């Protein structure tokens, strides 16, 4: 964010519910300042009633928006169009001029490619069945995962995600827990880092965690303990933010520079 807000300042922001914890304003306002962009990034913490009342107005006045829980799916009906990935995933987390995108999906693809590359022959277990789970499941499937198993508290959401994946030509099913012995990738898209059993982590080749406060969750601690490769929630948060800025401005600050800033400000630990 530049020091002075004026007539030409562009509005960006995050839409969600119960999101006081978010780091997104720090990330994007730091990027705007670093890149010399005349813009401000705000948080719109909305319950369902407020969301339905003001979403159209926000879409009219904001240059770009991010969307988080619980509106990644609901927001789609208010948009003029969605790109190929978000249409298939049926979830949007980035908006630019009333167009919807999914940078969670892009972040998972980017980060997994760096860690292990091709996913051929891997069995992937995704804990959760919301918007983040959808993005992760599609990204891993497109990277070549041989099967996707959805582990969720309720079968209704899990069934919907399995049907969506299978409709798109992927091999998906519901599991109560991971029961494979090798070549496993585990994703936690729930708010609970302890939902993944330790014996499942031990058998994994890669662990992916969406929770980023603290950065070293119980899941990440266990991955480190057993020498398992991992992608932590901060890496995902920052990379999806960088991908959003590329959509908005066709340029961005590097992941490394943003993470360094967040640690320097003691915003993460």
Curated annotation (Swiss-Prot):
Pathway the protein acts in: Metabolic intermediate biosynthesis; chorismate biosynthesis; chorismate from D-erythrose 4-phosphate and phosphoenolpyruvate: step 4/7
One GO term (biological process): aromatic amino acid family biosynthetic process
Catalytic activity: shikimate + NADP(+) = 3-dehydroshikimate + NADPH + H(+)
Binding residues annotated for NADP(+), in chain numbering: 128-132, 152-157, 210, 233
Binding-site residues, shikimate: 22-24, 68, 93, 104, 212
Pfam families the record matches: Shikimate_DH, Shikimate_dh_N
InterPro entries: Aminoacid_DH-like_N_sf, NAD(P)-bd_dom_sf, Shikimate_DH-bd_N, Shikimate_DH_fam, Shikm_DH/Glu-tRNA_Rdtase
GO molecular function: shikimate 3-dehydrogenase (NADP+) activity
This protein's UniProt keywords: Amino-acid biosynthesis, Aromatic amino acid biosynthesis, NADP, Oxidoreductase
Active-site residues from the entry: 72
Subunit note: Homodimer.
Family under the similarity heading: Belongs to the shikimate dehydrogenase family.
Protein name: Shikimate dehydrogenase (NADP(+))
């Amino acid at each position: 964010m530049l020091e002075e807000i004026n007539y030409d300042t562009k509005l960006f922001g995050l839409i969600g519910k119960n999101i006081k914890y978010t780091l997104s304003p720090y990330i994007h306002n730091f990027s705007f300042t670093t890149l010399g962009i005349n813009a401000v990034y705000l948080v719109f913490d909305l319950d369902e009633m407020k969301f339905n009342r003001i979403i159209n107005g926000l879409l009219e006045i904001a240059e770009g928006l991010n969307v988080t829980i619980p509106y990644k799916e609901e927001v789609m009906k208010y948009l003029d169009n969605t790109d190929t990935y978000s249409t298939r995933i049926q979830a949007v987390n980035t908006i630019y001029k009333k167009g919807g995108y999914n940078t969670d999906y892009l972040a998972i693809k980017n980060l997994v490619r760096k860690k292990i590359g091709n996913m051929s022959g891997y069995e992937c277990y995704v804990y959760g069945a919301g918007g983040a789970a959808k993005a992760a499941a599609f990204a891993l499937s497109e990277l070549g995962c041989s099967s996707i198993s959805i582990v969720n508290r309720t079968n209704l959401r899990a069934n919907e995600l399995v049907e969506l994946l299978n409709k798109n030509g992927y091999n998906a099913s519901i599991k109560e827990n991971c029961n494979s012995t090798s070549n496993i990738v585990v994703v936690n898209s729930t708010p609970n880092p302890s939902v993944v059993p330790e014996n499942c982590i031990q058998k994994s080749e890669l662990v992916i965690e969406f929770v980023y406060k603290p950065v070293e969750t119980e899941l990440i601690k266990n991955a480190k303990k057993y020498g398992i490769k991992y992608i932590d929630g901060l890496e995902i948060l920052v990379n999806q933010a960088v991908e959003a800025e590329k959509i908005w401005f066709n340029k961005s600050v590097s992941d490394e520079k943003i993470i360094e800033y967040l640690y320097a400000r003691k915003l993460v630990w």
